[in-house]
């Protein structure tokens, strides 16, 4: 197999290129090397997510054409103030506040605030077997809720970008931290909706400091 280093710097302002350069230096110091990606380049460029906006737009428009995307005007403080349940990774399960807005309501809200955009998920259980953690099931609507696809400033969400990138780069196995286990069901569902073949997932325990 081949190891791909993908730089997930969707928010270019918060993730300047020097951070990616430092990451490569740290990996080299640890004796970890990759076959393609990062500054090394390779056959599946671009490897920096900040350079892939046009690619993500194509998949975004496909989901939009399916009637699965809608504008959301909720602020983070409003969501946390609501007595909504939380996901296993600590985020608020979106209660669907803006899901049923009419065209007139959307137009009125746009006068005051630019919306972010969410993906409408079904009330469906997604089950998969993780290579390290074993069987895992989550209900998309109850345990996750409609999630962000694109921020109000136009930056695409991680949850969309990684699915598109994995497919275009021919990724067959994903090894990552257990903190992303709960993201996998919604990503698997998105692979299906976009007609893509998902990779196998392996979630490893995190290495944490004593404090």
List each language-model region with its residue ranges.
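N-terminal Rossmann-like or analogous alpha/beta NTP/dinucleotide-binding catalytic cores
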Residues: 1-87, 178-179, 183-196
């Amino acid at each position: 197999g081949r190891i791909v280093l993908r730089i997930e710097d969707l928010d270019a302002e918060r993730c300047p290129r020097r951070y990616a350069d430092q990451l490569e230096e740290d990996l080299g110091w640890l004796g970890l090397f990759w076959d393609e990606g990062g500054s090394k380049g390779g056959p599946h460029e671009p490897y920096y997510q900040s350079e892939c906006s046009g690619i993500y737009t194509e998949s975004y428009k496909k989901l939009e054409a399916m009637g699965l995307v809608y504008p959301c005007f909720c602020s983070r403080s409003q969501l946390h103030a609501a007595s909504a349940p939380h996901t296993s990774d600590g985020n608020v399960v979106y209660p669907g506040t803006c899901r049923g807005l009419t065209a007139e309501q959307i137009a009125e809200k746009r006068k005051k605030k630019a919306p972010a955009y969410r993906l409408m998920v079904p009330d469906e259980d997604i089950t998969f077997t993780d290579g390290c953690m074993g069987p895992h099931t989550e209900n998309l609507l109850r345990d996750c809720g409609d999630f962000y696809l694109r921020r109000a400033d136009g930056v695409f969400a991680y949850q969309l970008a990684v699915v598109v990138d994995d497919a275009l780069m021919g990724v067959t196995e994903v090894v990552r931290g257990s903190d992303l286990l709960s993201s996998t069901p919604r990503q698997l569902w998105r692979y299906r909706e976009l007609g893509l073949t998902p990779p196998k997932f392996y979630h490893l325990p995190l290495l944490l400091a004593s404090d």
